[in-house]
Regions:
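Conserved metal-phosphate-binding beta-hairpin within the catalytic cores
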Residues: 102, 194-215
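Active-site loop/lid in soluble adenylation, ligation, and acyl-transfer enzymes
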Residues: 1-146, 254-262, 266-311
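A short mid-domain helix/strand-loop element embedded in enzyme catalytic domains
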Residues: 134-166
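A long amphipathic alpha-helix within ATP-dependent nucleotide-binding catalytic cores
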Residues: 164-195
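Catalytic cores of nucleic-acid ligases and guanylyltransferases
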Residues: 31, 182, 209-218
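Short, active-site-adjacent segments that bind or coordinate small-molecule cofactors and metal centers
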Residues: 91-93, 189-197, 202-204, 272
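N-terminal low-complexity segments that are often proline-rich with Ser/Thr-Pro
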Residues: 306, 310-334
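C-terminal helix-cap and adjacent tail motif
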Residues: 215-278, 282
Length: 334
């Protein structure tokens, strides 16, 4: 846990710690912790928290025209110096109880579902697709938000509608698909494929939908090199797959039941290098320069009214068939 004596800690996830920052805002601190199979390793990956924060800030600013997001700043007096570079001041939201997953390629749990049923989250796909194959169109495959230690469960869109209401579920789906498309275009320009990603959303003070949590980071998105992409086999990715591969190798000594063992130095270094490379490829910036110009550490002025919850956007769901989430104390960190 990241110690901040002057802040009240609200929650801790596998990677992030959440603190109070007044009535309308929260402070999210990304640690260097790394997890696998719903456990946290005793070994951290130096600089990982900075990568997650820097990459989220880049994407929050890059995609702010698609949908308002909760990011306010990662600079200024509300950011303690001890966590500067890996902390975000964000708007407090009513979080939706559904994760929005978009898949552009057939991999991971999506591929497992397809092999078993020919569909992913109730969406039928063409027969004969290989692992890592590009899908005809990106698909929206929501999931539940599991408690810590449990696994998220894929759900179909009908179940998503029953949880959120039709109007809100459709808005979440359309926003998620557009965010994915925009992210995939940027990734392609940098020689990467955005295989899949997850988004989280909440409801702001004005009743509108707001993008939350992290955005298109190596922890929440699967990036592959476009060069050498080969359907039919798993692809090397810019995330913690290297850690998982080491862990399931018999040489690690892990029995799938005991607490996770320490990571070898070479695995830590290789993992850090993949995270840093993902950031530098996507942004064209050096992580060594983060945090940089204060003007790049805040939401653009034109967006602050919306992202701070004080804008005058009309609630798109008012008087429509929508289920409001119960008032939650905080975003639950992962």
């Amino acid at each position: 846990v990241t110690p901040l004596p002057t802040r009240r800690r609200l929650a801790s996830g596998k990677v992030r710690d959440l603190y109070e920052a007044g009535d309308d805002h929260l402070l999210i601190v990304a640690s260097d912790r790394i997890s696998a199979f719903e456990q946290v390793f005793p070994t951290s990956v130096p600089g990982k928290g900075r990568v997650l924060t820097a990459m989220s800030v880049f994407w929050f600013r890059e995609l702010a025209d698609v949908l308002p997001n909760h990011f306010v700043t990662c600079d200024g007096p509300l950011i303690p110096e001890s966590v500067r570079g890996r902390a975000l001041l964000v708007e407090r939201l009513d979080m939706l109880p559904v994760e929005a997953v978009v898949r552009g390629y057939l991999t991971g749990r999506g591929y497992s579902d397809y092999r078993r049923s020919g569909a992913v989250c109730g969406l039928p796909l063409p027969p004969g697709l290989a692992e890592s194959a590009r899908l005809p169109e990106p698909i929206f495959t929501p999931s539940t938000k599991a408690r810590r230690g449990d696994k998220d469960e894929n759900i179909d869109f009908g179940t998503c509608v029953s949880v959120l209401g039709r109007a809100l579920a459709e808005e979440v789906r359309e926003a998620s698909l557009e965010l994915y498309r925009r992210g995939a275009v940027r990734a392609a320009e940098q020689g990467l494929l955005l295989a899949d990603t997850k988004f989280e959303f909440g409801i702001g003070a004005d009743g509108g939908l707001v993008l939350a949590d992290e955005l298109l980071t190596p922890d929440s998105a699967r990036y592959w090199l476009a060069d050498g992409h080969q359907p039919g086999v798993p692809q090397p990715s810019f995330d913690k797959q290297h850690v998982r591969d080491w862990l399931v190798d018999p040489a690690s000594g892990w029995d799938c039941v005991s607490p996770l063992p320490p990571l070898p130095p070479e695995v830590v270094t290789a993992t850090r290098d993949r995270y840093v490379e993902a950031y530098q490829r996507i942004t064209g910036l050096s992580l060594a320069d983060w945090p940089r110009d204060p003007a790049d550490l805040r939401q653009p002025a034109s967006r602050l009214g919306q992202c701070g919850g004080t804008g005058d956007r009309r609630d798109p769901h008012r008087d429509q068939d929508v289920h409001r989430p119960r008032r939650s104390a905080a975003l639950q960190p992962r």
